[in-house]
């Protein structure tokens, strides 16, 4: 039996907009992110990311594309090289593009300040800082290349609630300051409500509901969305 990981997904995200992808585990959220970034090729349809079709890019063009579209993963510890200092890890994308180490570290210093990290952490290793600090490093690293699109795949799931709030505030500030297009992937309705202008609710790879976040969450039309929201204990969405 053929199973479609994604089926008929239609999604447009503009500069300065944060679009949420909401659904349960296994709904196809992360698969959609991988297709948008060109890590997976769709069997049909068209994907355009920053004006390009990522699955059809020549090898020589992929490095330029990676500059325009960046991803932040859930597990910041796995995302960072344990043998590299945080400063060098954040500067890695610049170094791959022949930026000198002093110039790259200067850019990283500016971004550490932007994401709320002290400069002294640039000489630390990933296992020497907290999970929230590591995630801020990953955000700084994603911003070094001045991307047009940022995809955040469950970026606060592994963090304590108090740290989650700080990271979500950071994402909101960065969107306003940098005019980024952002796709925020999460199973958590509270997270989507906090940071997203619009939302697509996904079930079994298909979009069951899409619209302005406040409207979707306060007046859901889909039974799946209503059930998803009702499953959150202590929440009075409906």
Regions found by a protein language model. Give the residues of each.
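A short, proline-enriched helix->beta-strand linker immediately N-terminal to the Walker B motif
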Residues: 144-148
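Conserved ABC transporter NBD signature motif
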Residues: 45-53
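Conserved ABC ATPase signature
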Residues: 125-129, 133
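Conserved ABC ATPase "signature" region
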Residues: 102-120, 229-230
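Helix-to-loop junction immediately C-terminal to a conserved catalytic motif
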Residues: 37
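A short, surface-exposed alpha-helical micro-motif characterized by mixed small hydrophobic
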Residues: 192-194
């Amino acid at each position: 039996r053929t199973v479609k990981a994604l089926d008929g997904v239609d999604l447009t995200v503009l500069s300065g907009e944060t679009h949420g992808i909401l659904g349960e585990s296994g709904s196809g959220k992360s698969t959609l992110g991988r297709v948008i970034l060109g890590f997976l090729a769709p069997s049909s349809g068209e994907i355009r990311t920053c004006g390009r079709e990522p699955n059809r890019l020549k090898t020589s063009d992929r490095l330029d594309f990676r500059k325009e579209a960046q991803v932040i993963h859930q597990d910041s510890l796995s995302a960072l090289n344990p043998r590299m200092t945080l400063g060098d890890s954040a500067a890695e994308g610049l170094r791959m593009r022949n930026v000198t180490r002093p110039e790259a570290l200067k850019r990283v210093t500016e971004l550490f300040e932007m994401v709320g990290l002290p400069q002294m952490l640039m000489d630390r290793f990933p296992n020497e800082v907290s999970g929230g600090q590591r995630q801020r490093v990953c955000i700084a690293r994603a911003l070094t290349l001045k991307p047009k699109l940022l995809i955040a795949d469950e970026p606060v799931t592994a963090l304590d609630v108090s740290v989650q709030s700080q990271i979500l505030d950071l994402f909101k500030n960065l969107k306003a300051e940098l005019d980024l297009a952002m796709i925020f992937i999460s199973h958590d309705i509270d997270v989507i409500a906090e940071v997203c202008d619009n939302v697509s609710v996904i079930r079994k790879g298909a979009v069951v509901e899409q619209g302005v976040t406040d409207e979707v969450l306060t007046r859901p039309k889909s039974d799946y969305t209503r059930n998803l929201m009702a499953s959150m204990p202590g929440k009075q969405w409906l």
